[in-house]
């Protein structure tokens, strides 16, 4: 199985980025300090850190590579020489690899844990190189189609998903209600930026403008039903309806906390009592999304939670990143998870006692991923 082979090798995830074909320039000598990313500039780079050639895939998965969190490649003012917009040619990955190789470090590698979109941009690009296919095609053929997922994928408008079935995100494109622009071209014309309500396109700027909508860090569209299947697959350690999609030990490796943090696995946030406190077992894991989403799996209690909101589809109240919907109760993910567990506990459906992980089931019922609201038991008082 390609998926198992891709993620199942300890040697693979410990390979250095610069050892992959096309990434030879991922070294300090290629770094440029430009735009907001000059040393001492507004981007926050305090020193010309070195050590790019030591960065491994596992460092990126743990967000310990030290790369600039958001280089803003499509913004000419911020990115400077790193500027890149590539809206239409998904097959052209050479230019974005070039920009990433020249992107400076914010911290010395392996010294700080800082979330960086670039980490998973790199991982997605390397997956494409390893499997010899675009990321969207590989996942569609190797995972989503096999699982029967009909509403999961990148660039949904390309597969004729009706726009009215897709939640809108920002009201005025990526302008933050007119507070943000992408600068000007050498001829004085403005750099392109979306100004209309975003619907059916990825909101993330780097994913849309630089990666043509297909990236390892953003751009995936789905539904609660489809995500329920994927979470059931994770809850069942790689098995779904009698088929193994990846070995259980691969998943356990991804959920093993990093040495100096109990809350970071490989791509997942782990340790339910810390990250999803207020009910989930210690085995719970999940992730949040900036646009207003969260997924959580509690394998001990066999609970999966999917929350898909379009929180950013609201006016900007404190430019450039605060939105009015941020004050809504649903915007506070951790509190919401706690409330779900409190309701289940009141109904007698969960307890506070952690139990061993259940035996890995050979299959899952086809209805296991369907979601419905369960009325709370009425009190006799």
Residue ranges and their predicted role:
Residues 218, 293-294:
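Beta-propeller and closely related beta-sheet repeat lectin domains
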Residues 236, 250, 259-260, 273, ...:
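Short, gly/Ser/Thr-rich active-site loops of penicillin-recognizing serine hydrolases
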Residues 289-291:
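Short, small/polar residue-rich loop motifs at catalytic or cofactor-binding pockets
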Residues 295, 302-310, 315-319:
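Short, well-ordered beta-strand elements
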Residues 17-284:
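Short, surface-exposed loop or secondary-structure junction motifs
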């Amino acid at each position: 199985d390609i998926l198992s082979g891709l993620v199942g090798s300890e040697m693979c995830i410990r390979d250095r980025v610069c050892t992959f074909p096309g990434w030879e320039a991922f070294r300090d000598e290629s770094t440029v300090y430009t735009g907001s990313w000059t040393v001492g500039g507004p981007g926050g780079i305090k020193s010309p850190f070195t050590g790019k050639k030591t960065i491994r895939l596992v460092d990126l998965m743990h967000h310990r590579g030290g790369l600039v969190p958001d280089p803003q490649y499509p913004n000419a003012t911020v990115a400077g020489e790193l500027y890149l917009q590539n809206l239409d040619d998904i097959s052209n990955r050479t230019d974005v690899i070039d920009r990433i190789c020249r992107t400076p470090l914010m911290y010395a590698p392996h010294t700080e844990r800082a979330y960086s979109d670039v980490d998973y941009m790199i991982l997605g690009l390397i997956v494409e190189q390893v499997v010899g296919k675009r990321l969207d095609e590989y996942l569609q053929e190797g995972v989503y189609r096999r699982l029967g997922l009909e509403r999961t994928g990148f660039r949904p408008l390309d597969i004729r998903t009706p726009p009215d079935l897709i939640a809108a995100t920002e009201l005025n494109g990526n302008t933050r209600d007119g507070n943000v622009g992408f600068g000007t071209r050498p001829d004085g014309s403005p750099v392109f930026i979306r100004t209309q309500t975003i619907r059916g396109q990825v909101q993330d700027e780097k994913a849309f403008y630089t990666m043509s909508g297909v990236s390892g860090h953003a751009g995936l569209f789905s539904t609660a039903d489809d995500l329920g299947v994927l979470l059931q697959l994770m809850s069942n350690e790689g098995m779904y309806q009698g088929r193994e999609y990846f070995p259980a030990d691969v998943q356990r490796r991804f959920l093993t906390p990093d040495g100096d943090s109990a809350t970071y696995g490989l791509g997942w946030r782990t340790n339910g009592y810390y990250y999803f406190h207020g009910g989930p077992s210690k085995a719970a894991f999940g992730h949040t999304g900036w646009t207003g989403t969260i997924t959580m799996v509690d394998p001990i209690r066999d609970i999966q939670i999917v929350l898909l909101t379009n929180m950013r589809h609201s006016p900007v109240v404190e430019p450039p990143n605060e939105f009015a919907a941020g004050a809504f109760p649903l915007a506070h993910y951790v509190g919401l998870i706690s409330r779900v567990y409190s309701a289940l506990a009141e109904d007698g459906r969960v307890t506070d006692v952690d139990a061993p992980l259940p035996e890995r089931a050979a299959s899952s019922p086809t209805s296991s991923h369907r979601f419905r609201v369960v009325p709370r038991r009425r009190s006799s008082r």
